From Swiss-Prot:
It catalyses: L-kynurenine + H2O = anthranilate + L-alanine + H(+); 3-hydroxy-L-kynurenine + H2O = 3-hydroxyanthranilate + L-alanine + H(+). Keywords: Cytoplasm, Hydrolase, Pyridine nucleotide biosynthesis, Pyridoxal phosphate. One of its GO terms (molecular function) is pyridoxal phosphate binding. The keyword Mitochondrion does not apply. Its cofactor is pyridoxal 5'-phosphate. This is Kynureninase. The gene is BNA5.
Length: 460
């Protein structure tokens, strides 16, 4: 592998880096005599926070201008209507045809609202219905802690304790959970499970769970199925409607580049909202923004839910947050959609894998050794992961100054290579097809190997 090969691959796969604001050595506060202050960083951290699309600044300023020029009037009479801007009362509606194809849902099955965990809690209150022996929730061990807290408290609301949470662990000698282990667990616990709710992509290992197969298995036993798509949305193609998923939640500040704490979203299969009559609607955490829009401002004490996922909205959304995520969603459409991006992503992460596995420091997943090196925790099969590779450094040292991962990460940071560390020993590398290139992926691995060489020589 060489930088020349990387450049040839860059000629085959377009980059949209020019559409984004890229942090530089100067903006990151990094002084390195080898580089000009204006040199772009290599940003491999879109799995934690996506970069800012350049058009986001204009989109936000348009709404600040509307606020300053018309105040409350902009809810119904936006000053930018002539150039296609939306009045605030309907600000989120233009996003539905943009997000629906990214998650593989119909427009009436998606809503832009809330935050990831608040949405998960809202879905749990509507879809977690323990009854008789079927009271338990199944999810993976090492799920993102916020999910665990939500599941635990949902169980406690119904009077159950943590014994009603079933978690599948990675088997000894493995680095991720096998699909057959999940299927076996669902089958063995079919009489106890009220809900199955895994991560679409596991945040720590980067594993892309087989959503279709797992959902089909659980549904065959009459079990409700939800998914946390925080690391899947905008990363891999999804087919939530066709997979018959009951509900899903996601955030937008990672692969959808909406900005820190950006507005999130939900999917609710249309079968759950088709009978949203006043008499028959499914109980949920409700609010006025989920009510029939034509009657919303009549302030009636009648909940008449919209016949779509929009009925799960509670309050009017933050206008600034909505237009921020809309900017990025429009980029997805502009470049041909998630399926086109996935083609590049598979090759880009495959290139990253090839570079890492060709190193003398690479240790196979099944190998047991304490030598200096690293393992890839993520599945090596390209179809079983998104863009992220989770790299485990060893041997483990508790002391910060000796810790291999910390020393590698510091060296990368000093060279303006931005990635995500997960203590005690993991660095998550995520080359994104929107704004990362094969050339910078090559350079990033080159720097990583340099760091390992310096550690081996006791130079850092």
């Amino acid at each position: 592998m060489s930088i020349e090969q990387a450049k040839k691959l860059d000629e085959c796969f377009p980059t949209y880096k020019e559409e984004f604001e890229i942090p530089t050595f100067k903006s990151l506060g990094i002084q390195n005599d080898e580089y000009e202050d204006s040199t772009d960083s290599i940003y491999l951290c879109g799995n934690s926070l996506g970069l800012m699309p350049k058009i986001t600044r204009t989109a936000i300023n348009d709404e600040l201008n509307a606020w300053s020029e018309r105040g409350v009037e902009s809810h119904f009479r936006h000053p930018g209507e002539e150039k296609g801007l939306t009045s605030w009362v309907d600000i989120d509606l233009p996003l539905l045809p943009l997000i629906a194809p990214i998650v593989g849902g119909k427009e009436n099955e998606v809503a832009v609202m809330g935050t990831l965990t608040s949405n998960l809690n809202a879905m749990l209150m509507s879809f977690y219905k323990p009854s008789g022996k079927k009271t338990k929730i199944l999810f993976e061990k090492q799920a993102f802690p916020s999910d665990y807290y939500a599941f635990l408290n949902a169980a406690k609301i119904f009077g159950y304790n943590e014994d009603h949470l079933i978690q599948i662990e990675i088997k000894e000698g493995k680095t991720y959970i096998e699909t057959e282990d999940i299927i076996e667990t669902i089958t063995n616990h079919q009489d106890e499970l009220a809900l199955v709710c895994f991560s679409g992509i596991q945040y720590y290992t980067g594993q892309f769970f087989n959503i279709g197969e797992i959902t089909e298995c659980a549904k065959s036993f009459g079990i409700t199925v939800g998914w946390d798509l925080a690391h899947a949305v905008g990363n891999v193609p999804l087919q939530l409607h066709d997979w018959d998923v009951d509900f899903a939640v996601w955030c937008s500040y990672k692969y959808l580049n909406s900005g820190p704490g950006g507005i999130a979203g939900i999917f609710v299969h249309e079968k759950h909202t088709k009978d949203n009559s006043i008499e028959q609607f499914k109980p949920r955490l409700a609010g006025w923004w989920g009510n029939n829009a034509s009657d919303r401002f009549k302030m009636l004490e009648v909940f008449d839910p919209i016949k779509s996922a929009l009925s799960y909205r509670q309050s009017n959304p933050s206008v600034i947050d909505v237009v921020a995520v809309k900017s990025s969603l429009e980029l997805f459409k502009k470049v041909g959609g998630i399926s086109e991006l996935r083609k590049k992503s598979v090759e880009l992460t495959g290139f990253l894998q090839a570079l890492l596995t060709s190193s003398k420091y690479y240790i196979k997943q099944e190998e047991t050794t304490d030598r200096l090196g690293f393992k890839i925790l993520s599945p090596l099969n390209k179809g079983d992961r998104g863009c992220q590779l989770s790299v485990l450094f060893q041997p483990h040292y508790e002391e910060y100054s000796k810790n291999i991962m910390e020393r590698v990460n510091k060296y990368l940071s000093d060279h303006a290579i931005v990635c995500d560390e997960r203590r005690p020993d993991v660095i998550r590398l995520a080359p994104l097809p929107l704004y990362n290139t094969f050339s910078e992926t090559f350079i990033a691995v080159q720097r990583l190997i340099e760091a390992m060489d310096k550690i081996a020589a006791n130079e850092i």
